Amino acid sequence: MKSEHLLGTSIPRFTYDTPTVPGNDFYALCEGEHPLCMIFLPGFDHPVSREYITRYLKTLPQLKGARLVCVVRSSAQAVAKATHGSDSPFPVICDGPGVLYGYLGVEQTRGLLSWSFAAQKIYKAARDAGYHYDTKAPQLLPLTLVVGHLGKILFTHSGRSQTDLPEDCAAISEIVRAVEKATAPTDGPADPHCSDETLTLPDLVGWDN
C-alpha cells in the first residue's frame, strides 16, 4: 500500500516518548515556523537506522528552514540504554509497539527484495562489526513525511528500498523548501476534529480519520 492517500489528512493529536522525556505533545511539536520532516526508520539498533541517524547528526548544520524528527520502532528505554541517556539535537520518537507505523501504513517487504546497493554496503559494514541478521526476515521500508500545523501531512514518500529516504540534512532541507513552495498558496487548516483530544500512541489503534 502506498502512502499517497495520506496527503492532506491530519495525524491525530497524541503524546509520545523520547529516550529522555515521556509524554510529549505531538501538536506542540508541529508548531513552529517551518514544517517537520518525519522519517520513519526500523528499530534504533537496526544498521539502516544507525547509518542514517549518524548521517543526520553529522550534517545537522545543513538543516536550514526545516525541522527533523526521526521515528524508531524501539522503546524509549531501549534507546536510552543504547545512547547512555544522552540527548539528541533533534527529537527521536520511540514507538516500540509500532502504533504509528500501523496507523500510517508503513510498508515492509521480505529480505533481499528491499536491499538496494547502498543497503548491502550498510549491512556488510554492520556484519563486519559483528552484527547478525536474518536475511529472510521482513524488513520495514522507510516513510518520509512533511507535516505542518495540527499534524497536517503536506508531503509523503514511501521508500521502495531500505535506503530510499533523504540521505542527509541538506536533502531534507531541499524537500521541505519544495513542499513549502508548492503548498504555500493553498495550505488550508487541518481537519479541526483531530485537535479536540490528546491521545496516547495506543489510542491511535482503530482511529477512524
Where are these regions (language model features)?
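N-terminal "domain-start" segment that seeds a small globular fold
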Residues: 1-31
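Residue-level preference for short coil/turn positions at secondary-structure junctions
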Residues: 7, 31-34, 64, 140
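Conserved beta-strand and immediately adjacent loop positions that scaffold enzyme active sites
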Residues: 13, 36, 143
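Structural microenvironment flanking redox-active thiols in thiol-disulfide oxidoreductases
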Residues: 51-103
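Thiol/selenol-based redox catalytic cores and closely related redox-interacting motifs
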Residues: 95-164
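A short, polar/charged loop-to-alpha-helix boundary motif
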Residues: 160-182
